[in-house]
């Protein structure tokens, strides 16, 4: 019998080379609140976080580049979504 998969452990094995000079995802200045709620629930890496004051915090550094937020929020919540420049981004290690 196998043990349950711990997603946090699996994600922790991946390697991220973050491009600090050029974020590949940028939120709109005034994003649609409903769209942000969808992104909070849909992002598999959990990068959209609701704060105690109701604001949403986002950090592209742990992005899996799956495109979920691009599909769900490009016109409503995101100003820009593109893949990171060459040599940057996620390196999947399939821990």
From Swiss-Prot:
Similarity comment: family membership: Belongs to the bacterial-type ferredoxin family. FixX subfamily.
Protein name (Swiss-Prot/TrEMBL): Ferredoxin-like protein FixX
Keywords: 4Fe-4S, Electron transport, Iron, Iron-sulfur, Metal-binding, Transport
Task of the protein: Could be part of an electron transfer system required for anaerobic carnitine reduction. Could be a 3Fe-4S cluster-containing protein.
Keyword Nucleotide-binding annotated: no
Domain of life per record: Bacteria
Single annotated GO MF: iron ion binding
Keyword hit for Cytoplasm: no
PANTHER family xrefs: FERREDOXIN-LIKE, FERREDOXIN-LIKE PROTEIN FIXX-RELATED
